[in-house]
Amino acid sequence: SEETRKSYPYAFCLTLTYTLDADGKLHMNYKVKNTDTQTIHYQIGTHPGFTCPLEDGEKFEDYVLEFEKEENAGFHSYNTEKLEFDMTTYTKALDHSRVLPINYPLFANDALFFTDLVSKKVALKNPATGKGVEVAYPDFETIAFWTAAATEAPFLCVEPWNGSAIRSDEDNDFM
């Protein structure tokens, strides 16, 4: 649209395809086609939110993020005043572990932005019941997790990204 062209001056076609297979798996495919006469620059990511907790009587704190591989990783937090990820801070979250217990205080500084994970699959689940959701993100470089912690919202967003919001180690010049 003309409105989009004011802030993103490239011609492109974005196709999002959601397919539910016979096993009940939801596949989300994103295709960006350059319809311009020049190279286009872009970042893309997803922001799906999942109910957490799933069942009555459960708490948000009953859930964990379980990664497919053992991780030695941490995250950067979002600075809500500067509206950027603070790349000067790093919180070690996984010390040769696959499991990150979650709670609302963990999200007190907004999103958790992981840039150094080996895993390309993560499950949000209650280990006591085994119930939850698994997200595979083989074509994405990074992943973030977010909830509205201040209101103890009953969901967690699992956000695979190629690119991110502005980071403290870069300028705000997109092009």
Where are these regions (language model features)?
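Short solvent-exposed strand-capping/beta-turn motif centered on an Asx-Ser/Thr pair
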Residues: 23, 33-38, 127
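Active-site pocket scaffolds in enzymes
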Residues: 131-175
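Active-site/ligand-binding surface loops and adjacent short beta/alpha elements
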Residues: 39, 49-137
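Active-site scaffold segments
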Residues: 27-29, 47-49, 155-161
